[in-house]
Design a protein with these regions (language model features):
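Hydrophobic alpha-helical transmembrane segments
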Residues: 1-69, 80-93, 98-99, 105-133
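Glycine/small-residue-rich loop that forms an oxyanion/phosphate-binding "nest" at active or ligand-binding sites
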Residues: 74
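Glycine-rich active-site/cofactor-binding loop and its immediate structural neighborhood
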Residues: 77
Length: 133
């Protein structure tokens, strides 16, 4: 159930009942481990295919957002709009419920992607042998 809610990769099990719902929270670390393993596998594949470092960094930057269906990115953008609006509390609550994207959301999502890209690229650039055991 956690896999189906938090990941776009198809899940072969489709059990949606109260028992599964109660266990979903306990399965989130397992889901994170699986998604991280897929991320690592993608990095290994890009390294094995000799994909240029810049392109590899771009793909690895987008992967965690893509595999989660961009769900967390949407929440991040909503929060940035509300927090940086410098509006009263009631107005911030309205901003959180608003489906439109504001300027602060756009600015901070660009900052987020640039920082993540720079981190991934510098990690790859430093030495790609980090993936070897």
């Amino acid at each position: 159930m956690a896999w189906g809610n938090f990941c776009i990769v198809p899940c072969p099990w489709r059990i949606w009942d109260d028992t599964s719902r109660k266990q979903m929270l306990a399965m989130l670390p397992v889901l994170g481990l699986l998604m991280g393993a897929l991320w690592y596998g993608l990095a290994e594949l890009l390294l094995w295919l000799c994909i240029p470092k810049m392109l590899s960094a771009a793909v690895l930057t987008v992967y965690p957002f893509f595999v989660s269906g961009f769900m967390h990115l949407d929440g991040y953008m909503d929060c940035c709009d509300a927090i940086f609006s410098r509006a009263p509390l009631e107005k911030k609550k309205q901003i959180l419920k608003d489906s439109r994207v504001g300027a602060f959301a756009v600015i901070w999502v660009i900052v987020l992607f640039l920082m993540l890209f720079a981190s991934v690229y510098s990690f790859i650039e430093a030495d790609a042998s980090y993936m070897e055991f």
